[in-house]
């Protein structure tokens, strides 16, 4: 590109120098104008050459920077956003080549639960999954997902505070996130979702990238098991192993599993204090008035669900 530009400029100068008739003199005005133009052209060529030469040097400097040692000890986190680029580089080099992309949502969840319900559950669950895998990290939670038609509204969009994406936007977001993580060096990229509306988009993205990547240096896996049968399996575990079962339904988009797991991250996001004050510290017949007991119940649920999901991830990654 640069050589063509220089050649074009040089050709122009040669033609201008050769054309000495009156028409040319009118164009340049006088010999001083011609010399001035020639100086400008030569300066442009010289500057272009200067700008082109540092490419190899810049690549060398970048390679040195990318290989530099950390100046301080590494921090500890399973969340990509809480790590430095050097820490991520070293973790990948040490074998942490699996990255989990968790998808949540912002939606209505009855009178007690914050709209970020799914995101709060993922905050507690994803690091547990990564720890059980032993070679994985968690990408930032994708907090915006399809929640219904925006205008006219449908589904959760009928309630204030819900944020919805179109299916196309959601899938485009996941495509770019997944491709970015592949570029970083992760070889197994895992999609999980805590909500039913997230599942088809993740399946579509996994299918598209599986075809386009063709297993060249990374693979993408949609692990539906986190949601289905992950939720149902967790409910069965709670009933059979812990002896806790709902005795009624209060009519809300809420249950003991959601509530207890949210409380592990932040009890106030289920309005624990306000419910205690109002005498409404229960859901579907199960009391949550003992904060310690409710949080411990949530931890057991998360432990089970994380183990269930980690097993599913191992299965797909090993195939």
Report the location of each language-model feature.
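Bacterial N-terminal signal peptides that target proteins for export
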Residues: 6, 23-35
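Residues marking helix boundaries in flexible regions
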Residues: 7-10, 46, 51
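Short, Lys/Arg-enriched N-terminal segments with co-localized hydrophobic residues
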Residues: 11-21
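Bacterial N-terminal signal peptides
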Residues: 32-44
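Extended, histidine- and acidic-residue-enriched regions that form the cofactor-binding/catalytic faces
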Residues: 49-190, 194-319
């Amino acid at each position: 590109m640069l050589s063509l530009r220089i050649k074009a400029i040089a050709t122009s100068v040669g033609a201008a120098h050769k054309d000495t008739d009156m028409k040319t003199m009118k164009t340049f005005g006088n010999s001083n104008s011609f010399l001035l133009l020639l100086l400008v052209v030569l300066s442009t060529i010289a500057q272009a050459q200067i700008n082109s030469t540092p490419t190899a040097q810049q690549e060398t400097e970048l390679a040195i920077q990318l290989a530099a040692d950390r100046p301080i000890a590494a921090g500890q986190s399973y969340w990509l956003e809480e790590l430095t680029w050097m820490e991520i580089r070293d973790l990948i080099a040490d074998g942490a080549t699996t990255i989990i992309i968790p998808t949540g949502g912002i939606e209505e969840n009855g009178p007690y639960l914050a709209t970020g319900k799914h995101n709060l559950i993922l905050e507690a669950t994803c690091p547990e999954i990564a720890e059980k895998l032993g070679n994985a990290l968690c990408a930032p939670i994708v907090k915006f997902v399809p929640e219904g038609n925006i205008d006219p509204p449908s589904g959760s969009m009928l309630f204030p505070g819900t944020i919805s994406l179109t299916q196309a936007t959601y899938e485009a977001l996941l495509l770019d996130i997944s491709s970015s993580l592949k570029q970083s060096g992760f070889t197994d990229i895992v999609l999980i979702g805590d909500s039913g509306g997230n599942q088809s988009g993740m399946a579509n993205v996994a299918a598209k990238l599986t075809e386009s990547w063709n297993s060249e240096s990374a693979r993408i896996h949609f692990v539906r098991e986190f949601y289905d049968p992950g939720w149902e399996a967790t409910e069965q575990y709670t009933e059979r192993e812990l002896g806790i079962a709902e005795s009624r339904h209060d009519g809300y988009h809420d249950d003991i599993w959601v509530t207890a797991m949210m409380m592990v991250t932040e009890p106030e996001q289920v309005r624990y204090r306000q419910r205690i004050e109002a005498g409404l510290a229960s859901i579907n017949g199960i009391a949550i008035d003992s904060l310690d007991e409710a949080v411990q119940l949530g931890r057991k649920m998360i432990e089970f669900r994380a183990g269930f999901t980690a097993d599913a991830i191992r299965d797909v990654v090993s195939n």
